């Protein structure tokens, strides 16, 4: 759910700020990016309004659950690093799962640091630290303690 709302808000920004530049300059764009541009061009104001409501509710919830001075630690992804040469379809499915874990920082304007701290049988597994608003420097300093 969070990844879907993030996609809508990001797509809305692309529609407002990037698509006019693309239409004016006609740059060469990869098929994958072009597909995302087309998706963004179809986002409606109602979808953006609903996504903004979700975002505001999420910010309120995170402010209560993770007040100033606290740091959340959680897995960066629900799986280890993708394998080299993995096909686009598999990567696309993995990307949505990944976005459900990493889009909280973009949705709440909080700093997040991800580090490859752990390892499982298939490769490195990242952990993320999520801080409170404007705690970027403090979060970076916490890395020395890990």
Task: For each feature predicted by the language model, list its residue ranges.
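Short helix-loop capping/hinge segments that flank enzyme active sites or metal/cofactor-binding pockets
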Residues: 3-54, 116-124
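Short, surface-exposed loop/helix-turn segments at secondary-structure junctions
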Residues: 81-99
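Structural helix-boundary/capping segments
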Residues: 107-146
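Small-aliphatic-rich amphipathic alpha-helix that forms the alpha element of a beta-alpha
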Residues: 93-115
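An anion/phosphate-binding loop that grips the pyrophosphate of nucleotide cofactors and donors
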Residues: 69
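Short gly/ser/thr-rich secondary-structure transition/capping motifs
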Residues: 52-60, 95
């Amino acid at each position: 759910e969070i990844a879907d709302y993030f996609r809508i808000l990001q797509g809305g920004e692309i529609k407002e700020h990037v698509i006019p530049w693309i239409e004016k300059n006609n740059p060469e764009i990869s098929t994958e990016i072009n597909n995302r541009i087309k998706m963004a061009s179809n986002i409606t104001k109602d979808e953006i309004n609903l996504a903004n409501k979700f975002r505001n509710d999420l910010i309120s919830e995170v402010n209560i659950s993770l007040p100033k001075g606290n740091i959340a630690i959680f897995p960066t992804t629900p799986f280890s690093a993708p394998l080299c040469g993995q096909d686009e379809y598999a990567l696309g499915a993995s990307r949505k799962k990944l976005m459900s874990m990493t889009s909280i920082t973009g949705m709440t304007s909080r700093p997040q640091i991800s580090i490859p701290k752990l390892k499982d049988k298939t490769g490195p597994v990242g952990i993320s630290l999520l801080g409170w608003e404007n705690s970027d420097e403090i979060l970076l300093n916490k890395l020395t303690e890990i």
